Design a protein with these regions (language model features):
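Ordered, amphipathic secondary-structure segments that act as subunit-interaction surfaces
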Residues: 18-26, 33-50
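Acidic, gly/ser/pro-rich intrinsically disordered tails
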Residues: 1-2, 6, 10-16, 37-40, ...
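Flexible glycine-rich surface loops and low-complexity tracts that mediate binding to linear polymers
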Residues: 20-34, 126-139
């Protein structure tokens, strides 16, 4: 996957950023709204907080888990369950993740298989924690001229999910406990 990142110059001053060098990025997956033409576009970027150059021993371990993300947030839009043309069950979700200074990031997520069937039943306001990877995928969008344009979507592909039923923003508080699901 190719992912857009935002890095401060002060972070990369003493780091060899040559093509082919391995680095470890620690940061936050953030969203930004950009007004384009007549609509808002959600931009997603990895905001880099630290970069580490791993030694050879660390590198082998890190290669086993090259892209990991953890989100702790609230479902802010109704889920959309569907089956792909290849028969895969998926659920699309939008998660609001709060951060400092009363800001929130809105992160699109996709759950597969058993997780998708479980997520289909989640409600707006539900508190969830999820683990997965940030993925990029190409898709075709028809424009006003009836031509197709290739675009890139960024989303979190969910591998594990925890539904925190005792801490949610729903209007009714009738459930307790938590559920844990892993693909």
């Amino acid at each position: 996957d190719l992912l857009p990142v935002i890095i401060s110059e002060r972070i990369i001053n003493d780091i060899d950023m040559s093509i082919g060098n391995y680095i470890v990025i620690d940061g936050q997956f953030r969203s930004y709204n950009r007004y384009e033409d007549t609509s808002n576009k959600l931009l997603l970027r990895v905001f880099v907080r630290d970069i580490i150059v791993p030694d050879d021993n660390e590198l082998e371990e890190l290669k086993r888990h090259p892209n990991e993300v953890f989100l702790n947030g609230y479902l802010c839009k109704e889920t959309k369950f569907r089956t792909t043309p290849f028969g895969r069950e998926i659920t699309d979700m939008l998660i609001a993740v709060n951060r400092s200074y009363n800001k929130s990031d809105y992160i699109p997520c996709i759950a597969w298989g058993r997780n998708a069937r479980y997520c289909e039943k989640l409600e707006v306001g539900d508190h969830i924690k999820l683990w997965g990877r940030i993925q990029s995928r190409k898709y075709q969008k028809k424009n006003d001229n009836e031509d197709y344009e290739t675009k890139t979507a960024y989303e979190v592909s969910v591998t594990k999910l925890e539904h925190i039923k005792t801490e949610n923003n729903r209007k009714k508080e009738d459930e307790e406990g938590e559920d844990d699901f892993e693909e």
